[in-house]
A protein has these predicted regions:
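Alpha-helical scaffolding within the catalytic cores
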Residues: 33-35, 157-167, 208-214
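Active-site-proximal C-terminal subdomain of hydrolase catalytic domains
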Residues: 52-59, 68, 179-279
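Caspase-like (clan CD) cysteine peptidase catalytic core
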Residues: 148-178
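Short, glycine/acidic-rich beta->alpha junctions
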Residues: 96-104, 112, 157-160, 203-210
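Structural motif
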Residues: 119-123, 175-179, 226
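The substrate-binding groove and active-site-proximal loops of carbohydrate-active enzymes
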Residues: 147-155, 197-204
Length: 279
């Protein structure tokens, strides 16, 4: 089923899709869901939300998400906790800016401090590997953490990929809202660059990003769901035409010439094709 067909279904029915590379991963996810829904024991997650958001220097994309989504969702009006958390009787923890590091995200997934959060909201850049890069299938859409300075070469210690999910992670019952380019998957052809009906090829084939797959099928019990972007994420997901957070209103058109999530080209020599950061 092409991603484009699913985009159309999403408008009316908000459909999801489940896909893994092996039968074992399907089995683990199915068992996790059945166990979560049928057990008489207390649910494995705590009544807690975590917001994880970066804000790199000289980077409009992450700073916009911080100002218009992460901070209002964390602090509400006047510095008070947002009412949505109070109404839901949730405790809220934040990893914002300098605290949004690779190691802190690993600890969130381990449930080290207060147990596994029921909801994780992350807003960051997503790693983009170019066509032909052998790392693309495993690392596309990896979470770019605050460990990266916002400019210069990016290294493995700066991002959080599928291979960084701890073996002792406690993900069972978690839902992850994952705002990052390629967080959910990658199309074969660029969804936005189709000049003269000649789309630019960006991958050998369409594929789902590995990080959500690993979280959903973790041997210790998988996450219940991951909500993420296929292809690039844009500030039009949360910003209206007047430059303010859009709330539930959807702007009538996309204007690629302004207000898009910036992309940052990485510098530094490497014997392999260079990955880039996408907003």
């Amino acid at each position: 089923m092409p991603f484009e067909f699913q985009y159309s279904l999403d408008i009316y029915w908000a459909v999801g899709r489940l896909w893994f590379d092996t039968p074992e991963e399907f089995r683990r996810y199915a068992q996790s869901v059945v166990r979560y829904e049928s057990t008489t024991a207390p649910v494995p997650t705590s009544r807690r939300g975590v917001i994880f958001a970066t804000a790199h220097d000289f980077d409009d994309a992450t700073q916009l998400f911080m100002r218009q989504v992460a901070q209002p969702l964390s602090f509400g009006e006047g510095g008070a906790p947002a009412a949505v958390w109070t109404r839901a009787k949730f405790v809220l923890d934040t990893c914002l800016g300098d605290k949004a590091t690779q190691s802190s995200l690993a600890e969130v997934l381990r449930g080290s401090e207060r147990g596994t959060p029921a909801l994780l909201v992350s807003g960051t850049h997503g790693l983009e590997c170019p066509l032909g890069d052998p790392r693309q299938a495993d690392m596309q859409g990896a979470i770019v953490c605050q460990d990266w300075s916002g400019f210069g070469a990016i290294k493995p210690e700066h991002w959080f990929a599928a291979s960084d999910v701890p073996a002792d992670a406690k993900l069972h019952g978690m839902i992850h809202f994952f705002f990052a380019c390629y967080g959910g998957g990658c199309t074969e052809f660029d969804d936005y660059d189709r000049l003269n009906k000649q789309p630019r090829r960006i991958a050998d084939r369409p594929f789902f990003s590995r990080l959500p797959q690993v979280k959903l099928s973790h041997p210790n019990g998988g996450a219940l769901a991951v909500l993420a972007h296929i292809e690039r994420a844009w500030v039009y997901s949360f910003q209206g035409q007047r430059g303010r957070a859009a709330g539930s209103r959807i702007p009538p058109r996309l204007d690629r010439g302004s207000n898009h999530c910036d992309r940052v080209s990485l510098v530094g020599r490497s014997p392999r094709p260079r990955c880039r950061v996408r907003g």
